[in-house]
Amino acid sequence: MPGRAAHQEAAAAGGAAAEPTAAGGSAGAVAQQPEQQGLAGAFPLVLKKLMENPPRDARLDKEKKIKLEEDEAAAASTMAVSASLMPPIWDKTIPYDGESFHLEYMDLDEFLLENGIPSSPTHLDLNQNPLMPVAKLEEKEPASASTGSPVSSSSTAVYQQSEAASSTESPPQNERNTPSPIDPDCVEVEVNFNPDPADLVLSSVPGGELFNPRKHKFTEEDLKPQPMIKKAKKVFVPDEQKDEKYWTRRKKNNVAAKRSRDARRLKENQITIRAAFLEKENTALRTEVAELRKEVGRCKNIVSKYETRYGPFDLSDSE
């Protein structure tokens, strides 16, 4: 009996121990289900994080790939623009430091020969473009006007009237070439001549204009030498005979003598100042003539050199 009781107690204890185990198993299964549901919900979040923030190595690879594609596109465009393998001219830089920069010598005659340009004017063919005489040119003008577009009758009439007026007004060619005569009085020579104002006053007629040595001209009578007049012999007149008639005649003679002396001195002063100016003007004109002769000689030398090289002038074409 005691053994049976002990066996029953042991079985009861085992059953009690088995119940907690079963309860623990069911509790573990219930706890495992929420954990699986949490992992399934966290996977999309992790994937989203990976897409937004990829690893560094993957990002570097992507940047290298994009840069490589851009370089290939730029190379393709460069090759499309220029088929040359050399870089463009504008990308080159030429250093200029005085030593590495050198100018190349080129012979001018060789350059002209390579390009087919004559080296001297004697090789030019003047017959390629000959100058047309004026007469032929005038003959061609009405022909070209007749073959051109038609013009209204009113404009044609106006043109003919103006042409007729110009033809009547225009002088002949010979008259046009001849220069108009120059008045010698209008020619002024630059002369450094400054006479004394006192001499000009003494050479001027009292109450008249100031004497101008540049413009004044003398007549032939003025320049003739004055005749020598012999003075009358002095006649002694006693004081008893010096009446009113004597003194009147004496005053008239003195006034006439003074007037003649003043006129003679005035003319002498004018001639002296005029002669001084003419001497200055003559010197200036001689200098100008010498310079003009030098210029004419230089022009003659140029013309002679031209004629010896190209032949004489053809004045018919120029006319």
Curated annotation (Swiss-Prot):
What superkingdom heads the lineage?
Answer: Eukaryota
| Record flagged with keyword Membrane | no
> A cellular component term (GO) from this record?
nucleus
Identify the keywords attached in UniProt to this record, alphabetized: Activator, DNA-binding, Nucleus, Transcription, Transcription regulation
Compartments where located: Nucleus
Q: Which PROSITE patterns does this chain map to?
A: BZIP (PS50217)
Tissue specificity, per the record, is: Isoform 1 and isoform 3 are expressed in a variety of somatic tissues, including liver, heart, intestine, stomach and kidney. Both isoforms are also expressed in hepatoma (LMH) cells and in embryonic fibroblast cell lines. Isoform 2 and isoform 4 are expressed in adult heart and intestine.
Report domain bZIP positions: 243-306
Region (Basic motif) spans which residues?
245-265
Could you tell me one molecular function GO term of this UniProt entry?
Answer: DNA binding
Q: Where is this region: Disordered?
A: 1-35, 139-186
Give the start-end ranges of region Leucine-zipper. Answer: 266-273
Say where the protein is mainly found. Answer: nucleus
List, as start-end ranges, the regions of compositional bias called Low complexity: 1-31, 143-158
Please give the annotated consequence of changing L278V.
Complete loss of binding to VTG2 promoter in isoform 3
- A biological process from GO: positive regulation of DNA-templated transcription
Q: Where is the composition biased (Polar residues)?
A: 159-180
Question: A Pfam family this protein belongs to?
Answer: bZIP_2
**Role, per record:** Transcription factor that binds to and transactivates the vitellogenin II (VTG2) promoter. Binds to the palindromic sequence 5'-GTTTACATAAAC-3'.
> Subunit details for this protein?
Binds DNA as a homodimer or a heterodimer. Exists as a stable dimer in the absence of DNA.
Q: Which family does it belong to?
A: Belongs to the bZIP family. PAR subfamily.
* Protein name from the UniProt record: Transcription factor VBP
Q: Lineage, please? A: Eukaryota, Metazoa, Chordata, Craniata, Vertebrata
